[in-house]
Structure formats: structure tokens, C-alpha cells
Amino acid sequence: MVETKPKPTEVQKKKTLYEVMFKSREFIIDVYLRFDCFIYLILGGFGFYQPSNLITLLNYSKSDLGLFNNTDSSISNNNNNNNNINTEEQYSTYDNNLLDNQNEFQIDNNNNNNNNEFIPLYQNPILISVVTMYTLMVSLVAIFQCLISLLALIQKEKSTKSILINLSLTLNFFLLLFNTYVLSTQSEIFSKFAYMGLIVSYIISLLDFSALFFLTSKHKSVLSVISSIFSFFLMCLKVRPKLPKLPKLNSNNNNGNKKKK
């Protein structure tokens, strides 16, 4: 007897949202890569536009003490030669390049009568230089991710496109590890507002990584690379140098005595 297939119902005829997303996965990936490219371009451009703006997010107070100043006058940015301070005599232990940067900052000493004064931490040029370098480094990473997303959009070969997507996922994974370390151990260096913003950005980056990973679930090389790295370290921990076994002197002597008897 020939089995007759049941007619599909109206519910079965309707395409579910999952089926639509599954069939148009490549289109959704392209749209998502465009979104990533736009976001990373904004982040990188903002970092290059104001690289020292991150210092406003640090946890400091105006009572923090920074660079030592042993004069009653203030550091000014005036172009008059008569009002310039001889920075070489005040900061003999610092490099000449840093000494030139001192003229960009001004300290109000009108209310202080002591001879020994300090530059507050938020006006310390060394701290500002370090924060600026860190911001530029993060901006370079954002621009690099923008270029990866752009190249993945341009490429037509699936193999090259998958390699670029895996590279972006790997970079996002290590950035998540770094942000996890900052949130767990270095949270006290940020103000409360900046710390909440850091948590929000961490959640957004985690959602970004999860969305891109599940959209490209066929590309599992990231997990294989990570698992291989962890397995290698575990193997290194388990391996012990095998030393040659020394002969047991007591057992050999006892056997020799028995043979003589």
C-alpha cells in the first residue's frame, strides 16, 4: 500500500522567524558587519580626536599630590619671556621633553603661602601622557577592527571571509579578557560614573561577541584554537621529566646472599 503524506497545515506553511534568519544568514552577517564597522570607526575616531579625555574619568581628588614644585609662583602658559619660569632649575630630574610640557599647565597658588607646593595628580603631565598613549592604543585597535569588518564585507570568497571573521572574534575575545581583568582588579582607578559606563560597555562588547559568534556558528576555528591553547598549557603542566630508576641496593644484596646459601 502506498502511504499518503498528510497535507501541510497552515501553520506549517508559514515560515518561522528562525527559518527566515537561517536562510538569509549571510545577509544578516553582512548587515551586522556594517554595523560593527560603523561603531568601531566612531570609537577610533573619537579616541584620536580627544586622546587625553580619559583622564576626566579617573578617580582622583584635587587634594592628590603629584609633581613637586618648590617655588611660590605658578606654571603658566604665557608667551612673555619675563613671566616664564625656569623649569630646568625646578625639575632637574625630569627629561627636557617633559619639562617643555610643564608650561601647558597652570597652578593657582594665590591662596598658598608655603614655599613647598605640589601639582595635583590630574594636572601631572606624566599621567596625562600615559593616559593619552593608552587611549591611542585602544583607538588603533578599534580602527583595526573596523578595517577587518570592512575587508570581510568586500571579500566574496567564503574562506577568506571566514578567516577575517575569526580574526575579529579572536580579537574581541582577548579584549573581553582584558576588560574582565580591569573590572575585577582595577576598578578603583575609575570614578563611579566611569565604572558604570565601563560595565555598560563591557556588556555591549559581550553581546557583540555573542551575536557575531552565533551568526557565524559554522566558523568554529576560534573555539578550536582556544581549546588547543588551553590543552597545550595543561599538557605542559602534566608533563614531568622522567628520571632513570636507580637500582635497589637492598634487594640485590638479599638476592645474592640467598644464591650463596
From Swiss-Prot:
It is found in: Membrane. It is a multi-pass membrane protein. Keywords: Membrane, Transmembrane, Transmembrane helix. Its main location: membrane. Disulfide bonds: none annotated. GO terms for cellular component: membrane. The chain crosses the membrane at residues 38-58, 134-154, 163-183, 195-215, 219-239. This is Uncharacterized transmembrane protein DDB_G0293304. It comes from Dictyostelium discoideum (Social amoeba). The lineage of its organism: Eukaryota, Amoebozoa, Evosea, Eumycetozoa, Dictyostelia.
